Amino acid sequence: MIVIPAIDLKEGNCVRLEQGEMNRDTVFSDNPAEQALKWQEAGAELLHLVDLDGAFAGIPKNKAAIEAIIKAITIPAQLGGGIRDIATIEAYLSLGLSRVIIGTAAQRNPELVIEACQKFPGRIVVGIDAKNGMVAVQGWAELTDISAVDLAKKFEDCGVAAIIYTDISRDGMMGGPNLEATRALAEAISIPVIASGGVSSLKDIENLMAIEASGVTGAITGKAIYTGAINLREAIDLTKRGCQC
């Protein structure tokens, strides 16, 4: 399992939101590229970028910051937020991103995921954000009537590289990930699952490592590495040593 630092972009800054609320944000850096380099130097093998403005607007909004990050780092980066069509996917991949994340559009237009996987094999990730097991879309502003497991199963055979599962009631709240829901999703599908939302201590990392056999291959952490609750280098070292759970 790998630990993946998150860089959430809002108006060109690196921020963290509480429970996905755009008006409950904390700015941690006005230089996202510098921040990205810091996480690379701490040993990160992959960066998780989110265009928050794009997620709410439905179109890319932080292109300059994203380009600057890609130029600054040598490790792979994946990006989500506002990706709703093939043209946007192609444009982002051509910038140098390793993978793109389809979120809202995966629920509203599953055919886009299938087409994107065919056109860009191994480079498409589906982001599933859920509250009480039900999928949330449009930057978490809208709750749907489809379950996270049912949505994930739609993509079982189309070549999705991973599913990022975020429990939005946990995100930015430093309360630990939803282990039960994450494990249930991972066990229901054959696609690798990356856990997100609430990962806020080394113990949380250990708990996720303990369910790695279910298919949980990564943990995204955001607020905790910015506040110092998690030392990223220590977390990465922990996953490399293996769980003693």
Swiss-Prot record:
Keyword list (alphabetical) reads: Amino-acid biosynthesis, Cytoplasm, Histidine biosynthesis, Isomerase
Give the species this sequence originates from: Trichlorobacter lovleyi (strain ATCC BAA-1151 / DSM 17278 / SZ)
Documented EC number(s):
5.3.1.16
Which family is this protein grouped under? Belongs to the HisA/HisF family.
- Give the domain of life: Bacteria
Q: Name one GO molecular function term.
A: 1-(5-phosphoribosyl)-5-[(5-phosphoribosylamino)methylideneamino]imidazole-4-carboxamide isomerase activity
Q: In which pathway does it act?
A: Amino-acid biosynthesis; L-histidine biosynthesis; L-histidine from 5-phospho-alpha-D-ribose 1-diphosphate: step 4/9
Q: Does the keyword Isomerase apply?
A: yes
Classification via HAMAP family: HisA
From the UniProt record, report the name of the gene that encodes this protein.
hisA
Its recorded name reads: 1-(5-phosphoribosyl)-5-[(5-phosphoribosylamino)methylideneamino] imidazole-4-carboxamide isomerase
